């Protein structure tokens, strides 16, 4: 499975580089982002490695996982041209800008001084794996 993600990520990065690195891409509005994501599960990669997946539900609700079986429910909203997410257990918003590149979404975290982007590596209608709550014995 990891080989599949790596292959998809390499292909996506190749298209991104060949297209000029997204220099001409425009930041998505909230309505464009909603139209692109609603009802989908998107898998993201960063620097050649799988990063996480997010399921986009109705009413701007989301479910995020770092692909470790642990999923966090949350929601998103638009603020000052950015798409901001709040997840259960954290009240601090995580804000991003999104652009539609030749191979999918490109996400830039607004609080990242090194500006390392996330790239959509797979758009899927399939469910991501969310294990149940941890039970201590």
Locations of regions flagged by a protein language model:
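Lipid interaction determinants
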Residues: 21-73, 84-137
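Bacterial N-terminal signal peptides
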Residues: 10-19
């Amino acid at each position: 499975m990891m080989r599949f993600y790596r292959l998809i990520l390499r292909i996506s990065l190749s298209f991104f580089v060949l297209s000029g690195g997204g220099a001409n891409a425009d930041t998505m509005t909230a309505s464009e982002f909603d139209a692109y994501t609603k009802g989908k599960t998107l898998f993201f990669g960063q620097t050649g490695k799988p990063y996480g997946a997010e399921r986009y539900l109705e009413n701007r609700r989301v479910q995020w996982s770092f692909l470790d079986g642990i999923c966090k429910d949350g929601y998103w909203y638009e603020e000052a041209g950015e798409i901001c997410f709040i997840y259960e257990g954290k009240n601090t918003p995580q804000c991003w800008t999104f652009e539609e590149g030749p191979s999918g979404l490109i996400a830039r975290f607004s609080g990242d001084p090194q500006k390392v982007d996330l790239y959509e590596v797979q758009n899927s209608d399939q469910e991501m794996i969310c294990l149940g709550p941890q039970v201590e014995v």
